[in-house]
Curated annotation (Swiss-Prot):
This is Calcitonin receptor-like protein 1. The gene is pdfr-1. SMART domains: HormR (SM00008). Residues 472-546 are annotated as: Disordered. GO terms for cellular component: plasma membrane. Gene3D superfamilies: GPCR, family 2, extracellular hormone receptor domain, Rhodopsin 7-helix transmembrane proteins. It comes from Caenorhabditis elegans.
Length: 546
């Protein structure tokens, strides 16, 4: 376990997004000090030096030394990250750390100019008039990178990096499946009026919040990939990706935390509603949605804005890039504390619902295994809804050289249970819901019937048109009219003695389908308040049985 100051003392929920970035950035920063990275950096120095001079001019630093100064100087140089101004020999120059993954821009970094007038290197081979010397970026390391250096050796760091990459792939698949399933479920609940009962509207808003979290995470993940492809030395002022856009990046993370809080809040409202319906029977009629709507979206907004205000006040309203490592700050408990409380209360709701359902089965003297399984199954449907997978996400777990394999299993399990939560919720409350399946089957049957009926009507219309065309053509002909009836009898598919009216078999089928639909529909268009969920149906059946 991590101590209170450990950068890994953060929920795996955020590790699923941040762990790979932290480990990969730490790995890249550590690797940037290698000889291979040094040799690769030399290839771009020649073309980067003009840019370095422009940067020095922009910062009011002299790119060239004073020709009247007879002292020995180190020339201005560019180490592919920072541009260093001319510096007198046997002295040093200090600059602010760059905005890069794994580096803290609030720290400073110092570069030494050797007494011989060349930039100091780690050894004599890295010193020369045309060489940039060695920049010791360990001065800029963030707490995460320092933690990695102190607690992970090369082998465990490699494993942690592999775990982070595999977890990212697992999350991509889970987020993609959740995205598709949530869009389908939301579309179904929104399209069919019979499904717009109160309990389904709660499910609908819960899935909307989950969908927004999924979309924001996918956008940030994809942006992180593009940021990495642009290279770690991309000029942050260019704003090519979200990660390099100051206001946009902070806004994305703010809305991510907001919709995460909205998800927790709608989970909590679902728990309150179901607990009151099953345990207390508060609502003889369905409650109004407006108070739930205000609470589900308004309270999280106030909650998230309060957290952001506290963070800004602490930092004197100087916002860090992408809000920095906000998930490591103690102020993050302003968000995580109430979320944890909602999860604990919802777990109590689950246990209480199971207890009530079990007692109702016993009181009804129906102790059959099938009845008990049905009640427990209905209660277990609440598990993904009320956020049990999130409990695993909120338990801090730190990787060290001693528990790296346990950490790998923990990370994979936590990533799977959270990132696939949207898929599980959509499956349980939509795709496997008998009521939804019945509505979809009815819709498909009516669609097939309508399609078949239209084809039959079109075929009938063509036959009637052929009949009249044949009749008119015969009447206008100059040939004798004695065989008109015989010719008509050969051309017409219908008996000449009778015609079917509008109430033929096809029309009757259409009327039956429409009457059946009108019979099942509610007058106000929002479904019946007394419709039974599997949960309520099992509860009421147990109560009414002798």
């Amino acid at each position: 376990m991590a101590d209170a100051t450990s950068p890994f003392n953060v929920s795996i929920l955020d590790n699923s997004t941040k762990l790979s970035e932290m480990v990969e950035s730490g790995w890249n920063v550590l690797a940037s000090t290698s000889v291979q990275a040094f040799n690769e950096a030399m290839d771009v120095l020649e073309e980067s030096y003009p840019l370095c001079k422009k940067m020095l001019d922009h910062n009011n630093l002299f790119p060239e030394r004073d020709p009247n100064d007879t002292r020995i100087w180190c020339n201005a140089t560019y180490d592919t990250v920072l541009c260093w101004p001319p510096t007198p020999a046997n002295s040093s120059v200090t600059l602010q750390c760059p905005h890069m993954k794994g580096l803290d821009p609030n720290k400073n970094i110092t570069k030494d100019c050797h007494v011989s007038g060349v930039w100091s290197g780690r050894n004599a081979g890295e010193m020369g008039p045309t060489l940039p010397g060695w920049t010791n970026f360990t001065m800029c390391y963030t707490d995460e990178v320092i933690y990695i250096m102190q607690n992970l050796n090369n082998e465990s760091l490699t494993i942690a990096q592999e775990v982070a990459r595999n977890a990212r792939k697992l999350e991509f698949v889970g987020l993609g499946l959740s995205l598709v399933s949530l869009i389908l479920a939301i579309s179904i609940f929104s399209y069919f009026r019979r499904l717009r009962v109160f309990r389904n509207l709660l499910h609908l808003h819960l899935m909307i919040a989950m969908l927004m979290v999924v979309i924001l995470r996918l956008v940030l993940y994809i942006d992180l990939i593009f940021t990495g492809e642009n290279g770690p030395h991309t000029n942050s002022a260019e704003g090519k990706t979200i990660n390099t856009m100051p206001i946009v990046c902070e806004g994305m993370f703010f809305f991510l935390e907001y919709f995460k809080t909205v998800t927790f809040c709608w989970m909590f409202l679902e728990g309150i509603y179901l607990n009151n319906q099953i345990v207390f029977g508060f609502f003889n009629s369905e409650p109004k949605l407006l108070p739930y709507f205000i609470a589900g979206y308004g309270i999280p907004l106030v909650h998230t804005m309060l957290w952001l205000l506290v963070v800004l006040i602490k930092k004197d309203f100087k916002v860090e890039r992408c809000l920095g490592s906000y998930y490591l700050e103690p102020e993050f408990w302003i968000l995580d504390g109430p979320r944890m409380a909602e999860l604990v209360i919802n777990l109590f709701f689950i246990c209480n619902v199971i207890r009530v359902l079990y007692s109702k089965v016993r009181e009804s003297n129906n102790t059959s295994e099938a009845g008990l399984k049905k009640s427990v199954k209905a209660a277990m449907m609440l598990l993904p809804l009320l956020g049990v997978p999130n409990i695993m996400q909120t338990i801090p777990f730190a990787p060290t050289r001693d528990n790296i394999m346990v950490f790998a299993v923990w990370t994979y399990t936590a990533s799977f249970t959270y990132m696939y939560q949207g898929l599980m919720v959509a499956s349980i409350y939509c795709f496997t819901n008998k009521e939804v399946n019945h509505v979809l089957k009815t819709f498909y049957a009516r669609y097939r019937l309508l399609h078949k009926s239209q084809n039959e009507l079109r075929r009938g219309s063509r036959s009637v048109a052929s009949h009249y065309a044949a009749k008119n053509g015969t009447a206008n002909a100059s040939a004798p009219q004695t065989n008109n009836a015989d010719e008509f009898g050969k051309l017409s598919p219908f008996p000449s003695r009778s015609k079917k009216g509008s109430d033929d078999s096809t029309t009757k089928l259409m009327k039956d389908a429409v009457m059946e639909e009108e019979k099942n529909a509610n007058n106000n268009g929002y479904g019946s308040a007394g419709e039974m969920t599997p949960l309520r149906e099992g509860s009421n059946r147990s109560t009414k049985s002798p």
